[in-house]
């Protein structure tokens, strides 16, 4: 699938704020600063569609981007940000749970993991928690280019060992676009 059109539509804090149409949603989850906005920009081939911040915890709403007038990429706030208060963390978790449980258009959850660091305990906890929902989960690693090529195969094996057998995992780099076309063609092509 070729992404010909991409635009920011809205920010939502509740299920009632979502657009009232029938387009499929693809939720992008991951730790703060894992590269969610950069991945959206790489998928859409637009450098500044999603604002990229060097400061963790900037995204506090669900940000919806409409692709090809047919599906939404939904950028969620990052989890695991230490400077968020417990109240903010609970509000975030409630918003995500409500979105997953009540959004009848959620097609897939894309869980981002930093390839260089590997899955953190927060990533693994989120992965286990997501198993309770009847939604396809895709693991996408980011920052593949940050690891020396001689160490990549070993890191791929380490990452695969942390998830359930048969889990679909994509290795990507927003910087070099490595793996982006494969992700688009395999996960968004039928949309």
From Swiss-Prot:
The keyword Nucleotide-binding applies. One of its GO terms (biological process) is division septum assembly. This is Probable GTP-binding protein EngB. Belongs to the TRAFAC class TrmE-Era-EngA-EngB-Septin-like GTPase superfamily. EngB GTPase family. Its cofactor is Mg(2+). Keywords: Cell cycle, Cell division, GTP-binding, Magnesium, Metal-binding, Nucleotide-binding, Septation. PROSITE patterns: G_ENGB (PS51706). GO terms for molecular function: GTP binding; metal ion binding. Residues 22-191 form the EngB-type G domain. Mg(2+) binds at residues 37, 59. GO terms for cellular component: cytosol.
